């Protein structure tokens, strides 16, 4: 079985104006995460080279904040061009919040292949986890990305206290969008966050993967944040459940599995790694 590996780079971290209860980058909570307006282009390129060395096909440029303004758009485009020049075979993904069709077209011109903007949860449950922007604005940004000609990467976070009905509604919304890839994150409570919910069991997490793939058979289901903590020794069962991709290395503000360990284990299990996108 061939799977896709993706890596992410947090190129602008923290001080986000939004009050998302699950996020340590929100200015509404006190955390000890690193905060910076921009990462040096040379460091981004170095991380991209390391991602490629670790068999990654996708490389995501992530910025904290509500969305793109002119300055941030220019910076992300600069980063994309720098990575493309030095590591031409990576598929570049941008994750920069709310964006207009015109802004997204600029990202595409700069070499961005796919835009990631998660709905996070259902329309009904969203007001319980964020009050500073609407679920509808997130949905619209996804429509904008499609109109701009970008591939769509859209998923969310499970384990925030949502009901099974919420999960079903969430998947129905994803079906409307039909994203190219669908990231699944499992919420891990942090003492600094307002949101404190019990950790999902491995069985429940694997059921979420199965249900997502059943709802979105044409999408690449990507298991991301919380994989190592929630699933532990069962984490590679995600591929039997329908996943076709994982995020390797560190996440935005938390440590992930050492990429070399993932690669060794996956090769031992007979997996190969996608080197191009079909």
UniProtKB/Swiss-Prot annotation:
NCBIfam families linked to this entry: bioB, PRK08508.1
GO BP annotations, alphabetical order: biotin biosynthetic process
Assembly notes: Homodimer.
PROSITE patterns: RADICAL_SAM
Stated name of the protein: Biotin synthase
Cofactor notes: Binds 1 [4Fe-4S] cluster. The cluster is coordinated with 3 cysteines and an exchangeable S-adenosyl-L-methionine.
EC class name: transferase
Pfam families: BATS, Radical_SAM
Reaction equations catalysed: (4R,5S)-dethiobiotin + (sulfur carrier)-SH + 2 reduced [2Fe-2S]-[ferredoxin] + 2 S-adenosyl-L-methionine = (sulfur carrier)-H + biotin + 2 5'-deoxyadenosine + 2 L-methionine + 2 oxidized [2Fe-2S]-[ferredoxin]
Molecular function terms, GO-annotated: 2 iron, 2 sulfur cluster binding; 4 iron, 4 sulfur cluster binding; biotin synthase activity; iron ion binding
Keyword annotations of the record: 2Fe-2S, 4Fe-4S, Biotin biosynthesis, Iron, Iron-sulfur, Metal-binding, S-adenosyl-L-methionine, Transferase
Lineage, highest ranks first: Bacteria, Pseudomonadati, Campylobacterota, Epsilonproteobacteria, Campylobacterales
Residues reported in the UniProt entry to bind [2Fe-2S] cluster: 60, 95, 153
Pathway terms, separated by semicolons: Cofactor biosynthesis; biotin biosynthesis; biotin from 7,8-diaminononanoate: step 2/2
InterPro entries to which the protein is assigned, alphabetical: Aldolase_TIM (IPR013785), BATS_dom (IPR010722), Biotin_synth/BioAB (IPR002684), Biotin_synthase (IPR024177), Elp3/MiaA/NifB-like_rSAM (IPR006638), rSAM (IPR007197)
CDD domains: Radical_SAM
Source organism: Campylobacter jejuni subsp. doylei (strain ATCC BAA-1458 / RM4099 / 269.97)
PANTHER family reported in the protein's UniProt record: BIOTIN SYNTHASE, BIOTIN SYNTHASE, MITOCHONDRIAL
Assigned protein family: Belongs to the radical SAM superfamily. Biotin synthase family.
Thylakoid keyword on record: no
């Amino acid at each position: 079985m061939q799977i896709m590996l993706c890596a992410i780079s947090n190129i602008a971290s923290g001080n986000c104006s939004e009050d998302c209860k699950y996020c340590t980058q929100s200015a509404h909570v006190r955390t000890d995460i690193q905060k910076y307006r921009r990462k040096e282009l040379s460091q981004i390129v170095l991380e991209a080279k390391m991602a490629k060395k670790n068999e990654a096909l996708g490389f995501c440029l992530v910025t904290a904040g509500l969305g793109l303004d002119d300055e941030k758009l220019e910076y992300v485009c600069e980063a994309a061009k720098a990575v493309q020049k030095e590591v031409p075979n990576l598929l570049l993904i941008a994750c920069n919040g709310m964006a207009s069709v015109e802004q997204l077209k600029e990202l595409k011109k700069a070499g961005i292949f796919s835009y990631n903007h998660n709905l996070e949860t259902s329309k009904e449950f969203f007001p319980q986890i964020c009050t500073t922007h609407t679920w509808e604005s997130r949905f619209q940004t996804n429509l904008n990305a499609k109109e701009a000609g970008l591939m769509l990467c859209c998923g969310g976070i499970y384990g925030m206290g949502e009901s099974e009905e919420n999960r079903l509604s969430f998947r129905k919304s994803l079906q409307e969008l039909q994203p190219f890839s669908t990231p699944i994150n499992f919420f891990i409570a942090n003492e600094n966050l307002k949101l404190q919910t019990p950790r999902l069991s491995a069985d429940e997490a694997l059921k979420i993967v199965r249900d997502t793939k059943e709802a979105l058979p044409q999408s690449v289901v990507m298991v991301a944040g919380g994989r190592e903590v929630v699933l532990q020794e069962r984490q590679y069962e995600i591929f039997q459940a329908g996943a076709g991709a994982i995020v390797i290395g560190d996440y935005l503000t938390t440590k992930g599995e050492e990429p070399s360990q993932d690669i060794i284990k996956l090769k031992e299990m007979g997996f190969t790694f996608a080197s191009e996108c079909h």
